Amino acid sequence: MPRIQVLDIRGSKESVGSTPHLRAAILEGLLKPPGSRTLPSETLYDEVGLKMYNDGMKAWAEWYYPVEAERQILERYGRDIAKLFTTSAKGKAVLIELGAGSLDKTSQVLLSAAEITRTTGPMNNIAYYALDLERGELERTIGRLQEVIGDQIAGKISTAGMWGTYDDGIRVIEKNELELEPDIPVHILFLGGTIGNFSKQDGDVAFLKSLPLDHKRGDTLLVGMDRHKSADAIERSYGFAAAKDWIMNGLKVSGRVLTGDEGLFEIGNWERYAKYNEELGRYEAGYKSQKEHALKISEGVDITFLKDEVVLVMFSNKYTDAEMDSVVDSAGLVKNGSWMDEKAQYCLLSLRANNGPV
């Protein structure tokens, strides 16, 4: 097996995802008035949380429709999608996946790209980088990727990790820290419907605008968006058993980051909150206080939670077709192509800057 290369691209120890930054974000959310308190979703993705999430997705893929829908799209339309990964005059390109997770879905993307790529010698034409917050999980998942499809992509696609945040990845592209030749296009993968974790028609647009897509060299973005559907269907799909343990692990992470004590948030004082918010068109998850109780974080910092108060830790937007079009247009992007699963539950979009080549 090839050596697993992981680039440390973290901008600084104070960057997003670092303990000092995460502690500040946790405090900021908890010091809001009751009824509007939050915990950052990063608390769900420590090494333990990532493994719980990835294992849960595999075990409950039948119920958690985004996994099956995205897999179906990539298997059915993978070659069409890969054909939109433009290359340089020498046939080279870079793929960077933001928030790579388990890489299961990525395998099909890379297999499709390998099928259509041409080789000009012993060097790999396409370089794939998986970006994520946890180095250990990156090494584990890239190692697994190499075990499963390494022989099929050998000589065509190289694989490596990027240890850092979305912002770090964006900086690497903007400042060309990979030292790419000017005409080598960069194709960003943002799969899993993760764009729905930003505020709708606001944070999602701002994030897409922040992506440095260079139209002159043919950069693209492949993004997954979850389509609007009934509340019952959504709540049922998120109701798998592992989801509770995964969400509750966020309280342990928050306690550890705040004071070093994973038991700071007594689990008995909380239950998992999970509900589809019809008004905002999003699934919400977090914690519901079982009784009024106080939490002492440090000298002079005490927080009282009310009975039945909800603290949100994550949400996932579900988009109507009109909302998808609005987000894309507002971000200054245009579609190269779009694909849906057979039940029309989920959509993959290939996007480029609106002044890019047709």
Curated annotation (Swiss-Prot):
GO terms for biological process: methylation. The gene is trpM. Optimum temperature is 25 degrees Celsius. Keywords: Methyltransferase, S-adenosyl-L-methionine, Transferase. GO terms for molecular function: methyltransferase activity. Methyltransferase that catalyzes iterative L-tryptophan N-methylations to produce L-abrine (N-alpha-methyl-L-tryptophan) and N,N-alpha-dimethyl-L-tryptophan. Also catalyzes a third methylation to yield L-hypaphorine (N,N,N-alpha-trimethyl-L-tryptopan), an agonist of the phytohormone indole-3-acetic acid. Can also N-methylate the non-native amino acid substrate 4-hydroxytryptophan, but the ability to incorporate trpM into a functional psilocybin biosynthesis pathway is indeed thwarted by the inability of the L-tryptophan decarboxylase psiD to use N,N-dimethyl-4-hydroxytryptophan as substrate. It holds the Pfam family Methyltransf_33. It comes from the Eukaryota. This is L-tryptophan methyltransferase trpM. It catalyses: L-tryptophan + S-adenosyl-L-methionine = N(alpha)-methyl-L-tryptophan + S-adenosyl-L-homocysteine + H(+); N(alpha)-methyl-L-tryptophan + S-adenosyl-L-methionine = N(alpha),N(alpha)-dimethyl-L-tryptophan + S-adenosyl-L-homocysteine + H(+); N(alpha),N(alpha)-dimethyl-L-tryptophan + S-adenosyl-L-methionine = N(alpha),N(alpha),N(alpha)-trimethyl-L-tryptophan + S-adenosyl-L-homocysteine + H(+). Its EC number is 2.1.1.-. Belongs to the methyltransferase superfamily.
